[in-house]
């Protein structure tokens, strides 16, 4: 039986940079935008990027995307169970 090959999803040119926010950063984000955690857009725990990062439900991801006009912009996703 052949060994399963691993693919680093973050090396693909179309996959933006992801990182897990610390608890302090998460609280600051919620305070800055005056929102509750339930108001964040969601991303499923089975998403390949979430699995690759090892994020758990309840974690908040910061995603850095390229923009033709702004250079880069950040958006945030709450990891939820499937």
From Swiss-Prot:
User: What EC class is this?
Assistant: transferase
Question: What Gene Ontology cellular-component terms does the record carry?
Answer: cytoplasm; DNA-directed RNA polymerase complex
PROSITE patterns referenced in this protein's UniProt entry, alphabetically = RNA_POL_H_23KD (PS01110)
Specify whether Transferase is a keyword of the entry. yes
Its domain of life reads Archaea
Gene3D superfamilies registered for this protein in UniProt: RPB5-like RNA polymerase subunit
Which UniProt keywords are present, listed alphabetically?
Cytoplasm, DNA-directed RNA polymerase, Nucleotidyltransferase, Transcription, Transferase
Q: Where in the cell is it found?
A: Cytoplasm
Q: What is its EC number?
A: 2.7.7.6
Presence of keyword Nucleotidyltransferase:
yes
Major localisation: cytoplasm
Its Gene Ontology molecular function terms? DNA binding; DNA-directed RNA polymerase activity
- InterPro entries per UniProt: Arch_Rpo5/euc_Rpb5, RNA_pol_subH/Rpb5_C, RNA_pol_subH/Rpb5_CS, RPB5-like_sf
What reaction does this enzyme carry out catalytically?
A: RNA(n) + a ribonucleoside 5'-triphosphate = RNA(n+1) + diphosphate
Biological process terms in GO annotation: transcription by RNA polymerase II; transcription elongation by RNA polymerase I; tRNA transcription by RNA polymerase III
What role does this protein play? DNA-dependent RNA polymerase (RNAP) catalyzes the transcription of DNA into RNA using the four ribonucleoside triphosphates as substrates.
The record's comment on protein family reads: Belongs to the archaeal Rpo5/eukaryotic RPB5 RNA polymerase subunit family.
Its quaternary structure?
Part of the RNA polymerase complex.
- State the protein's name: DNA-directed RNA polymerase subunit Rpo5
Q: Name its species.
A: Thermococcus onnurineus (strain NA1)
Q: What is the lineage of its organism?
A: Archaea, Methanobacteriati, Methanobacteriota, Thermococci, Thermococcales
